[in-house]
Regions:
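Polysaccharide-binding surfaces and accessory modules of carbohydrate-active proteins
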Residues: 21, 37-159, 205-253, 257-261
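Preference for bulky hydrophobic residues occupying beta-strand positions
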Residues: 34-36, 66, 196-198
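Extended, loop-rich substrate-binding clefts of extracytoplasmic carbohydrate-active enzymes
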Residues: 1-45, 154-178
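Short beta-strand segments enriched in hydrophobic/aromatic residues
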Residues: 25, 68, 198-200
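Short Pro-Gly-centered flexible turn/kink motifs
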Residues: 60-62, 184-200
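Short acidic/polar mixed-charge low-complexity motifs
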Residues: 28-30, 58, 70, 190
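Conduit-forming functional cores of very large proteins
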Residues: 39-44, 169-172, 182-185, 200-202, ...
Length: 265
């Protein structure tokens, strides 16, 4: 987030297979905790973003937008996105909106060839809380209007969440975003957790079949524990106990970094 308020404290806690950012806003009396990790032990890949908002002040109504300001769709190489951005965006599309888990992809392959080939698969973006899936805002104009730097969501700041959620969205000829819109009343010290998975899926049916499995209330917490245990399992070979715990963890991390690049011994 863009926040220049001196009364905001931000810290980062890093583990071998996950990390957490904790931001406490003493001006508006709320705390945000964001945890990232790679989903382990599943037949599909995902980057997990787990966000917990805590109200530190009196009971209040919160309007929350959490997500990504840009999603480059599947099928567009980074080099072509930078050199032919206007052409590449004309191929972009979004599907699976009816199931609240959009799939972002380029309709055709971007190769300069005589034969046009259809892309298969896309990048999914799944947001959910204890009540189920939440369809994200996918049109950046709904939030940022003409603010092309994507730093300040003008429509959200000026008109609120209801206006943004009711905006007539379009996904053709543009690079999409993905923001989950949430309105919550939180009492003192009450928190709210929003989880997001993003990754690649071969088709809509594949990711739709996984939705009930992922929506289990303990799913994210269980997977976070598994992710941390996975790193410990593969670094126990070099487990070291010295007078400095930081040095002990340095040995583990160096070992992990090396075999991820060069292979497990």
């Amino acid at each position: 987030s863009v926040n220049y308020d001196a009364k905001v404290k931000r810290t980062m806690r890093i583990k071998a297979n996950s990390f957490r950012i904790i931001e406490t806003d003493y001006t508006h009396n709320f705390k945000t905790e964001i945890t990232y990790f790679i989903l382990p032990h599943e037949p599909f890949g995902a980057l997990v973003r787990n966000v917990t908002f805590t109200n530190l002040g009196e009971e209040a109504d919160f309007e929350i937008l959490d997500g990504m300001s840009r999603i480059i769709p599947y099928g567009i190489p980074g080099t072509k996105f930078t050199t032919m951005a206007n052409l590449m965006r004309s191929y972009n599309t979004v599907s699976n909106l009816k199931n609240d888990v959009p799939l972002f992809f380029s309709r055709i392959e971007s190769d300069d060839a005589a034969e046009m080939k259809e892309n298969v698969g896309g990048y999914y973006y799944m947001c959910f809380d204890n009540n189920g899936t939440i369809c994200p805002i996918y049109d950046p104009c709904a939030l940022f209007e003409n603010e092309t730097a994507l730093q300040f969501p003008i429509n959200f700041i000026m008109h609120g969440l209801k206006f943004v959620a009711g905006y007539s969205q379009h996904f053709t000829n543009k690079i999409s975003c993905a923001f989950a819109p949430v309105a919550k009343k939180l009492s003192t010290n009450q928190n709210y957790t929003l989880s997001t998975l993003c990754g690649f899926a071969h088709n809509e049916d594949f990711i739709n079949r996984l939705i009930p499995h992922i929506l289990d209330k303990e799913y994210i917490n269980k997977k976070l524990v598994e992710a941390d245990q996975l790193a410990l399992k593969y670094t126990n070979d070099i487990a070291t106990t010295t007078g400095n715990p930081i040095l002990d963890e340095y040995f583990r991390q160096s070992y992990l970094d090396n075999f991820l690049r060069g292979g497990y011994p």
